[in-house]
Amino acid sequence: NIEDKTKLHDELEKMFKAADKRYNSGLFSGQHIIFDLNDEVIEKIIEGLYYPQSPYLFNIIEPNMLGKMYEMFLTEELSLADGQIVLQPKKDCKNRSVVTTPDEIVRYMVDKALKVRCSGKSPDEIKKLKVADIACGSGIFLEEAFSKLQACCVDWYLKNDRSHLEAIQGGQYKLPLDEKKEILTNCLYGIDIDVHAVEVAKFSLLIKLIENETAPSVSSSEKILPDLDGNIFYGNSLVDDSMLDGLNVKPQERLEIVPFDWNEMHVEVGFDIILGNPPYVNTSDMHNLLPKVEIDTVYKKKYKTSYKQFDKYYIFIERAISKLKSGGILCYIVPNKFFKIVSGKKLRGLIADAKILRSLDDFGDAQLFADKTIYSSILLLEKSAQKSFIYSSLDNVAALWNASKKDEIEVSEDKINSDPWRLTTDIAFMRLLDKIQQVAKPITDFVDIFNGIQTSAERPEPIYWFTKSEVVDETDSSYVIERNQRRHSIQKQIILERWNI
């Protein structure tokens, strides 16, 4: 309680310095914490955090919700326009590289990846695992991984040494704070090219750390929060300093590229698990967003998967595989187009030749992301030779947790190579496709196709749209439109199904 509002600046600075000694997390560090804010501005900021000006009660909001709030702001930046300071989308968000992953997907992916490595292990073994998200954003995957690692340890103690645990509300148990700190600092790592996202990820993990803690439970800790500077890093996980050595890279370009020194992580033999939702950025957007040297000299020359009109997530998959230890797990949610399109050839070959595909959840044309048209799949790789993988076809997110709604089939690794993957859960149809492949000749033996349908092309109107002015006739079952001096009949049922009418 600061009664004299004219002393807000000085008193808050004292409080922050005391908090820095107590919490030791870097949140309150620095000689000029409040910079040049005056008392009136500080008062407005503080009042804005509490009722009635704020609709939120921050003491009861879930930690992951705080991360989501911050993630919303990560997509915008202050900019000067017509003499006014305005908020506008960052250029990478305009180009779809920032996508918020639904909670159910995050939980499923973390559970799937960690189950492989945590099952049957003791807490001492679990605390040796190294888990990373190399495009971590606000840290939602790392938060969920932190929760899952704790849960695995709690389950082990419940069976083997219940006295080690601390009871909390609802008949539940938790790990002691010091052991949670140990898991956080030993096991979890993240990198992001957005410096603000890095700070949000650190903050979210620290909030997660003190979840279910009380004043008595933290009283024994001299330093309540750990410093996460050795866990969450700012940088470009796709570009090492060594990749730029000998190149004529301008200082400004190097600042934009933000090369990352992987030695800072002190992870000697690779990660046990890498998971997340890497950026989706097509080649044309990369040319608008990134320095030319980064694309032409690093991506195109250092990565095998940078083939033709490649997408950025291709090289994220390649990079992640290279950073796994032998037997390590990679779990990514990515567009499913790479199964089939020409530019995915080298990525398909990389996965198929090494026989590392463990499972593939394919959502077909079901849409999982708000306000984004993305045809998604969940890719699980294990960096050791596999004999077969599980292919699943799903209509929605709920099917992930419901075996009866999940169409799946076991497929031999020998069935896939760098050619487009012909995957279906219909065994008879798969055999038919195999037979056609064996006896038929591809159309490319007869004609040269410059471009097919541009599935991701930018156009003001999709090709299946038409306006009332184009309709020249109508029957009970179809519309007839005229376009480019030709008439086309379109069945009404197709339109009804397309728009779920």
Language model: regions and residue ranges:
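Short glycine-biased active-site loop of nucleotidyltransferases that positions the nucleotide triphosphate
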Residues: L368-T373
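Residues that form generic nucleotide/phosphate-binding pockets
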Residues: E11, M15-A18, K44, G48, ...
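Generic amphipathic alpha-helical segments used as scaffolds and interaction surfaces in large
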Residues: E3, F28-D36, P52-I60, D92-T101, ...
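C-terminal substrate-recognition regions of SAM-dependent nucleic acid methyltransferases
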Residues: V41, V269, K323-K325, V342, ...
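SAM-dependent methyltransferase catalytic region
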Residues: Y56, Q84-L360, D365, I378, ...
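Alpha-helix initiation and N-capping motif
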Residues: K5, H9, D39-E43, P63-L66, ...
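Non-catalytic, mostly N-terminal accessory regions of nucleic-acid modification and defense proteins
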Residues: N1-E104, Y108, K115-R117, L206-L209, ...
